A protein has these predicted regions:
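Short, ordered loop/turn segments at secondary-structure junctions
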Residues: 17-19, 144
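A mid-to-C-terminal "edge-of-domain" accessory segment
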Residues: 43-166
Length: 166
C-alpha cells in the first residue's frame, strides 16, 4: 500500500521497524526503505536521504532492534532475514554462484546481509563445493569423493539429520 501511495504522489510514509510501531497496519520501513533506494522505479524519482553506506547498516539495525525487544529476528523478512538471500536447491545454487543476478534482486551486501548457499539433500555439487571452499578445502567437480559426500548427506537427511547450517 505504501508503494502504491508513493506512486500516487504521497511524499511521506509513516512506518515501523520490524512491524513494531504506533499502530497495526503501518508499513515496515525495513522493507520500504531499501525498495525506494535500490529499485530503479523509485530511486531515480525520490529522495530518501539514505545513502549506500547507511543502507548497509539495515540488517544490523533490524536485528539489533529485535535484540533490544528480546525477540527472535524474522528469518523470512525481506532484505534483512537470514533466508532472504539463502538457497539450498542445486540448480539455484549453481546459477547463483556463477552470477548472483540470476536469483537475487539486489546484492545482499547493499543491506548488510549475506548470501548463503546451504548444504542439504536438495543441493547439488555447487552447494558442496562452495561449502568446502569456505572452509579452505578445494575439491574438483569430478572428484569421486564429492559424489560420496553428497550421497552420505542425502542418506542422513532422510533419517533426520540437518546440514543447512553447515
Amino acid at each position: 500500500n505504501s508503494l502504491a501511495a508513493i506512486e500516487a504522489g504521497v511524499r511521506q510514509v509513516q512506518g515501523t521497524i520490524n512491524g513494531i510501531g504506533e499502530r497495526c497496519g503501518n508499513a515496515n520501513l525495513v522493507t520500504i526503505i531499501p525498495t525506494l533506494v535500490l529499485k530503479e522505479a523509485f530511486n531515480t524519482r525520490f529522495e530518501t536521504g539514505i545513502d549506500a553506506e547507511k543502507l548497509q547498516g539495515l540488517t544490523q539495525l533490524a536485528h539489533g532492534f529485535d535484540e533490544m525487544l528480546n525477540r527472535s529476528p524474522d528469518h523470512q523478512a525481506p532484505y534483512v532475514g537470514a533466508s532472504a538471500f539463502a538457497t539450498k536447491a542445486g540448480i539455484h545454487a549453481s546459477a547463483l554462484l556463477k552470477d548472483p543476478r540470476t536469483y537475487e534482486h539486489v546484492p545482499p551486501e547493499t543491506v548488510g546481509n549475506l548470501r548463503k548457499v546451504m548444504v542439504s539433500d536438495q543441493g547439488g555439487k555447487s552447494n558442496f563445493i562452495n561449502a568446502l571452499k569456505r572452509r579452505g578445502i578445494a575439491v574438483a567437480k569430478d572428484d569421486p569423493r564429492l559424489d560420496q559426500l553428497i550421497s552420505i548427506v542425502k542418506e542422513r537427511e532422510a533419517t533426520g539429520y540437518a546440514y543447512e547450517g553447515a
